[in-house]
Swiss-Prot record:
It comes from Dictyostelium discoideum. Keywords: Cytoplasm, Leucine-rich repeat, Repeat. It is found in: Cytoplasm. GO terms for biological process: aggregation involved in sorocarp development; cell-cell adhesion; cell-substrate adhesion; chemotaxis to cAMP; chemotaxis to folate; culmination involved in sorocarp development; establishment or maintenance of cell polarity; intracellular signal transduction. Disruption phenotype: Loss of function mutant is defective in the regulation of F-actin organization. Pfam families: LRR_1, LRR_14, LRR_4. GO terms for cellular component: cytoplasm; phagocytic vesicle. This is Leucine-rich repeat protein lrrA.
């Protein structure tokens, strides 16, 4: 498109525009006339560009340039002439082919630089001369380190170096006195420098998916933190006390090797999300969790918990409670769980439950309920009081029947009851008018209720691996629509007891 674009850029239509938007236009080459533009914003992302012409340096008014998602492998030194440039986006290109020009350091007004996803293994030290830089994204590259001189970027507010191969962070980061967000997740870090605790304005610290063996004891001095992500650092056995982090809203200590939760957790009254999943050495929750009254999400998946403390009933704002893959029995789930009246998602799968607590009937806000892969023998009648439920999964249990009250779940959309021992279904299930998917496979059903013929909204009805005679197997093999139509068509005769599965099969074959 180079030739046509050249003439267009010469025209008044583009030349005097403040914003030149050429995104997603399959452009593979920029003409020299690009330098004649008087725009403040030049948007060229999602094209097929390989090079940037040297005339780019003539854009005397440009403040924003977006070259993201091209195939650019070379930045001309003339880019250093763009004295007015404030934001430069070069993510998702191929800049590893040629070293990035050191002239990039001449961009004294640059506040935002994005070099992410370029397979870079080196960066020019001259970036440290971009003294106005507030946002620097060098994530998703192949960096083992970055220049120590980056510590001179005193105005930096956001630094993203995630998805690289960093083995350490330099102590020079203490110069980032204005830093608010630091993301160094998905690297090879074993330790953090103590100087990280000097970043007094830091609100978000993400060091997840590393190889951290130890954390600075002074972590609790970072009182501005609102989001602390330590997840998936398998060697980490100890998290220092966090009692001073009174503004913390999100804490993830997932997949560590801790045997107890950090001291002072109960003092973090602003916490909204607490992720403690996949800590198999952790066997109990401290009772002071009761003070976390603002908590909305509590993830305890994959621990060795045998008891839920009564104090969990104080978490009245909780919306999601994940207790999957623990060792809970019905005797160790307190009745106080019924106080969680704002709970929208309750997950109890992969435990040792033989029954469900009847107190779940109090959870009127519940939308999603899972208790699959337990040893449940019955569903409490009270389940029918959860009229707002949209998804239920009780697969992989020992259920032999479904209570008639199940038909009251008028908002239910997905119902998974596979791999049980259900031999009969209640006729009230025609009340599941909102249901789009029902899985009853791998049970002991011989007949489906005729009322299923009224569930016209069903797109998936799986009744495979049941000894069904009504409907007959040839109908079942044809799928959901055929099953629903067959039940509807034969309902009248079937209710009179004049229809057998074999007889209908023969009628359909004629």
């Amino acid at each position: 498109m180079g030739g046509n674009l050249s003439s267009e850029l010469k025209s008044t239509k583009y030349r005097k525009r403040e914003i030149v938007d050429l995104r997603k236009m399959n452009i593979d080459k920029l003409p020299p006339t690009i330098g004649a533009l008087q725009c403040k914003e030049l948007l060229l992302s999602e094209n097929d560009l390989i090079t940037i012409p040297e005339e780019i340096g003539k854009l005397s008014k440009v403040e924003i340039i977006d070259f993201a998602k091209n195939r650019i492998n070379y930045i001309p030194p003339e880019i250093g002439s763009l004295a007015t440039l404030k934001q430069l986006f070069l993510s998702n290109n191929k800049l590893f082919y040629t070293p990035i020009t050191p002239n990039i350091g001449a961009l004294k007004n640059l506040t935002r630089l994005d070099l992410s996803s370029n397979q870079l293994d080196d960066l020019p030290v001259e970036i440290s001369n971009c003294e106005a830089l507030e946002y620097l994204d060098i994530s998703d590259n192949q960096l083992q380190s970055f220049p120590l001189e980056f510590g001179k970027l005193y105005n930096l507010q956001v630094f993203n170096c995630s998805k690289n191969s960093l083995k350490s962070l330099p102590s020079e980061i203490s110069g980032w006195v204005k830093l608010e967000e630091l993301n160094v997740s998905n690297n090879q870090l074993a330790f953090l420098p103590n100087q990280i605790c000097l970043l007094g304005l830091l609100s978000t610290l993400n060091v997840g998916f590393n190889k951290l063996q130890q954390l600075p004891e002074e972590l609790s001095s970072m009182v501005s933190l609102t989001n602390l992500d330590l997840k998936v650092n398998p060697p980490l056995q100890y998290v220092p006390q966090l009692s001073n982090l009174r503004q913390l809203k999100i804490l993830s200590i997932r997949n560590l090797q801790i045997t107890h939760l950090p001291l002072g957790l109960g003092l973090l009254s602003e916490l909204i999300e607490l992720d403690i999943r996949d800590n198999p050495q952790l066997k109990e929750i401290p009772y002071d969790i009761a003070t976390l009254i603002n908590l909305q999400k509590l993830d305890l998946f994959g621990n060795n918990m045998r008891i839920v403390p009564r104090e969990v009933g104080n978490l009245i704002n909780l919306q999601t409670l994940d207790l999957r893959q623990n060792k809970l029995t019905i005797d160790n789930i307190p009745s106080e769980i019924g106080k969680l009246v704002n709970l929208k998602k309750l997950l109890l799968s992969n435990n040792l439950l033989i029954a469900l607590p009847p107190e779940i009937a109090s959870m009127k806000a519940l939308k999603e309920f899972e208790a699959s892969n337990n040893q449940l023998q019955a569903i409490p009648t009270e389940i029918g009081e959860l009229s707002g439920l949209t998804k239920i999964n009780l697969s992989g249990n020992k259920l032999t029947s479904i209570p008639a009250s199940f038909g009251n779940l008028s908002e239910l959309q997905i119902c998974d009851l596979k791999s049980n021992e259900i031999a009969e279904l209640p006729t009230t299930l025609d009340g599941l008018k909102s249901c789009t998917k029902i899985d009853l496979s791998h049970n002991m059903l011989t007949e489906l209720p005729w009322e299923f013929g009224d569930l016209i909204g069903l797109t998936i009805l799986d009744v495979g691996h049941n000894p069904l005679t009504i409907p007959p197997n040839p109908i079942v093999m044809k799928g959901t629509e055929s099953i629903i139509q067959w039940l509807k068509k034969n309902e009248k005769e079937g209710r009179k007891g004049k229809v057998s599965g074999l007889g209908i099969q023969q009628d359909n074959e004629k």
